[in-house]
Amino acid sequence: MNKLFLVIVILSFSPMFAQQTDVEFTPNNSWLKAGLTAGIPVGDASDVSSFNLGLDLRGQYLFNPNIAVGIASGYSHFFGKDNFDDFGVVPLAGFFRYYFTPNGLFFGGDVGYGFLTNIDNNQGGLYVNPQIGYHNRDWNIYAFYQNTFAENDVDIQNVGVGVTYNIRFK
């Protein structure tokens, strides 16, 4: 069921790209975002992990001054507590952002697949990551809730903050 949902979400993004026949990438409409995240595990993940740190990598295309889409990836490392091992999530997702103004509030989210590392008998599952934050030309600071609905009824959830720097294409 999760894989079917993922396919539906990916196909829903395809009409946006199909309608743009003369897409031109410029420093004003496309860039890379690279940054760090820090969070606290919630739900079942809080039983086996005390906190997490991660990398956030994104490629963004701005359709107009308010709407952006792109590809998101990175790595979230969960530090095990007590006798539990560390583990991680590597997302591969599409993302959407709505910017209210050129500098200020934004909201958005990622939807894709989260690959799990160092967890036996579980490859991963549906990955969602809604966000709300502040942005300017160079920086994004945001709060997020991240959930990977993995196989065998394992949900890996955390809440946290992140910061990314915009690397413009020239």
Region spans (language model):
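Bacterial Sec-dependent N-terminal signal peptides
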Residues: M1-E24
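Short glycine/proline- and aromatic-enriched beta-strand/turn motifs that initiate or cap beta-hairpins
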Residues: A18-Y61, N166-K170
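Strand-connecting loop/turn motifs
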Residues: P27-W31, L62-N66, F100-G104, Y134-W139, ...
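Residues that define the transmembrane beta-barrel architecture of outer-membrane proteins
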Residues: N28-L32, S49-L53, D86-L92, N122-V128, ...
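Outer-membrane beta-barrel "beta-signal"
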Residues: K33, T37, F106, N136-D138, ...
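Transmembrane beta-strands of outer-membrane beta-barrel pores
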Residues: A38-D44, L53, S73-F79, F100-P102, ...
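Glycine- and aromatic-enriched membrane insertion/assembly motifs of diderm outer-membrane
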Residues: I40-Y99
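Transmembrane beta-barrel domains of outer membrane proteins
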Residues: R58-Q60, R97-Y99, Q131-H135, T164-N166
